[in-house]
Amino acid sequence: MGLTSTSTGAGAADTALVLRRERPDDRIVALAGNPNVGKSTVFNALTGLRQHTGNWPGKTVTSAQGRCERGGRGYVLVDLPGTYSLMAHSAEEEVARDFLCFGGADGAVVVCDATCLERNLNLVLQTLELQPRTVVCVNLLDEAERKGVRVELEGLSRRLGVPVVGAAAGRGEGLEALMAAVEGVISAPEPPTPVPVRYPPPVEFAVASLRPLLEPRLRGRLPARWTALRLLEGDGAFLDRLSAALEWDPRADAALWGAVEEARADLERQGLGGGAWCERVVSALVETAEAIGAASVTQLRSAAGRREHNARKAAQRVQGPWIYRNGRGGAFCGYPDLERSLRV
């Protein structure tokens, strides 16, 4: 969802990033993805030499935006920093999250690596919670084919609840279909309905208690479910950004903030105080990403391919938890029925 270009204006003042439109009706599209998934290749293939680079204001993080046209419509693509998460534990994650929230994007594309899809889906799920007008681009299909990996694109789309387009951007394949899907989700009267991540019952109860209060206050500018989680986190810097962007400080809203404090107290009573409930949220994201990936990828054909795939999986299980423990600490919790429910 996020604040759109209509609600923020051409300058996207909330991020202080000047968006370089050539026409007032140019679409603003955020391009997100993990590092090394070919995101820059997609960006370069679509925009060619029509690019502008610099730094995000106040950050030592490189910014890039470029323009392309398809079917008479102009698009400004904003290449977000490569990140594994939107939980804002680094400058890159903060930039990506804040642009998706406040940067005026009409929609988003999340680029994934077809050869290690499961690892990429964590960011996809987080992006969908924030911006449902999203298209998932499964890139590097040519490399996946060489390694004997097949991604079931239609099944992946069903499990995520948003359009999924396959691409081999290095060969220019799939880009027309990608932009057609982008236009489709942006121009649709209603956004897609992504399949929500199921959090532990105490967290879902806390979120549900806040949504009726948030929806009339947000008025569609940000998703109430996603915002409820952020209020429960209580990140002061993000709340300052939220207050400036919406001209409304939730901390000064007695009824709402009282409900936030009560929801936190209830989580504490159930043994999920402090950062414990955040760890469970991260666990649910990781488990859901793994289950969707496992249900959407056909295993490799050759013994050599299987060895490489298993090595990638082992590395992922080492690196993935390290990334999240680095920010939150704690162990992951499993949901044994999740994979079965996602094999639809």
What do the PLM-derived regions correspond to, one by one?
Residues 161, 191-344:
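Extended helical scaffolds that flank P-loop GTPase cores
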Residues 2-90, 102-103, 107:
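Conserved G1/Walker A P-loop phosphate-binding module
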Residues 36, 43, 50-53, 128-135, ...:
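N-terminal alpha-helical transmembrane segments of multi-pass membrane transport
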Residues 66-72, 95-165:
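Conserved C-terminal guanine-recognition region of P-loop GTPase G domains, centered on the G4
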Residues 30, 42-43, 61, 77-79, ...:
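Residue-level signature of catalytic and energy-coupling elements of molecular machines
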Residues 57-64, 76, 88, 92-95, ...:
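Helical mechanochemical/support elements of P-loop NTPase systems and associated helical scaffolds
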Residues 49, 58, 82-83, 114-118, ...:
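Conserved nucleotide-binding/hydrolysis micro-motifs of P-loop NTPases
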Residues 142-198:
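Canonical P-loop GTPase G-domain recognition
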